[in-house]
Amino acid sequence: MSLRSHLSRLLRTQVHSVRKKSVHSVAVIGAPFSQGQKRKGVEYGPAAVRXAGLMKRLSDLGCHLKDFGDLNFTPVPKDDLYNNLIVNPRSVGLANQELAEVVSRAVSGGYSCVTVGGDHSLAIGTISGHARHCPDLGVIWVDAHADINTPLTTSSGNLHGQPVSFLLRELQDKVPQLPGFSWIKPCISSPSIVYIGLRDVDPPEHFILKNYDIQYFSMRDIDRLGIQKVMEQTFDLLIGKRQRPIHLSFDIDAFDPTLAPATGTPVVGGLTYREGIYITEEIHSTGLLSALDLVEVNPRLAVSEEEAKATASLAVDVIASSFGQTREGGHIVYDQLPTPSSPDESESEERVRI
């Protein structure tokens, strides 16, 4: 291990040792929005993830919760294509503006903000709202796709494949002004984002990644390096020189479709359960997670109720492991074992037998 990597890991361990007994204050925002793409059903993602036990799981971890409920986005009655291609630009722009306000309120109130989508165009709003209070944030984008097409390079017209292009400062001379998007201010730079899990990248996106020096780890890189080394290098890049808030944007299609079948754009050869949860466990261990998106759960695309439940349950695992659930068992701090000399000796003995 390099000296830099060793020092970075040591610093993260020290931060974790200070914070490991702290209680997370977590705000949960449901974002039932589907107009960043054309497949219906992803608007039911928040309800599915809630039904899979999200709030109880976070509560059992000792989190102090504030539930903003599922947002009611303002409908746009007439939302014509932009440039005869881009789908629902006004709806996407307005929904993200509304979401950014709620995320901003949550972060300013001292909460770690969890947004459950909904499609990945919502990251425009979550990262914009987060950056208002944490302008130096770093983004870890876990996804099968880079989502960095511009409105001029996209072939699908779907804005859930373009959110990063609106957020990245270096791309602003390549991005036209879409109706409904005038409020957006680019808020991250190329060195402030790292991709993990890529395996379906369009040619223009690959050009952007290479020519704008954006760090990414494809599934081939994960196979070659191993997920531990990928996370070490990710942290070296984002927090190796200075500690700063982390925004984790996690698309459920980062996982292999055998694990997360109920999603709109599945791609074979994705993350295993162990790899995906290792990512979130390591992010939690930094003590720096400030906001998390969990997107693209689409229960309507499951071929069975079991597939829908499995995908939603996996989403809950991703979120819970980001806030302290471990595979050794997620526990509220247990400070002391009962002793035979305690007043409730018989009751303690019975508890130990159980």
Swiss-Prot record:
InterPro entries, A to Z: Arginase, Ureohydrolase, Ureohydrolase_dom_sf, Ureohydrolase_Mn_BS
UniProt feature coiled coil, ranges: none
Cofactor: Mn(2+)
Pfam families assigned to the protein according to its UniProt record, in alphabetical order: Arginase
Region (Disordered): 332-354
EC number of the protein: 3.5.3.1
Protein name: Arginase-2, mitochondrial
Gene: ARG2
